[in-house]
């Protein structure tokens, strides 16, 4: 898996997941960063990630409830990562969620133009300052919410060997 072993092909059956991973790794190679390895066991965490943003199949727009949902889910995700043996940093994971409130949902949409795509790739590599240096493991799922496709991606550091 992403503990340094050779990378297996993406197990996801969605071609868009493979395309996103390929694009990310190309971007990372160009920047001299390590490539990401697909990690199947992280896919379930994408469910936790998307849950605050969706209610009954529609995007959530109630800002007041929203931030408390997100905090709860972030704690759950941190706990789940920790349980699975992944390191928790100050910037412990980079999810396909932008920085601002319900606008976060917009950053989950797969980028349609080149500028958006570059922003997504930069964000998924730890932001402008590449804050998380040793990102290694990637998982992603594609969801249709209110008739639009959203990409829920998670990037974390390498597992800590026991």
Indicate residue ranges for each PLM-predicted region.
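Short, well-ordered surface patches within globular domains
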Residues: 8-79
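A well-ordered secondary-structure block
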Residues: 68-162
């Amino acid at each position: 898996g992403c503990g340094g072993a050779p990378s297996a092909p993406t197990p996801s059956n969605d071609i868009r997941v493979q395309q996103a991973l390929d694009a990310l790794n190309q971007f990372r190679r160009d920047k001299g960063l390590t490539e990401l390895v697909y990690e199947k066991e992280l896919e379930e965490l994408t469910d936790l990630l998307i849950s605050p943003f969706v209610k009954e199949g529609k995007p959530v727009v109630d800002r007041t409830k929203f931030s408390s949902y997100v905090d709860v889910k972030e704690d759950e995700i941190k706990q789940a990562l920790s349980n699975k043996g992944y390191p928790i940093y100050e910037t412990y994971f980079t999810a396909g969620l932008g920085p601002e409130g319900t606008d976060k949902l917009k950053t989950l949409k797969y980028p349609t133009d080149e500028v958006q795509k570059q922003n997504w790739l930069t964000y998924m590599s730890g932001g402008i300052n590449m804050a998380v240096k040793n990102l290694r493991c990637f998982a992603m799922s594609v969801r249709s919410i209110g008739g639009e496709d959203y990409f829920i991606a998670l990037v974390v550091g390498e597992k800590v060997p026991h």
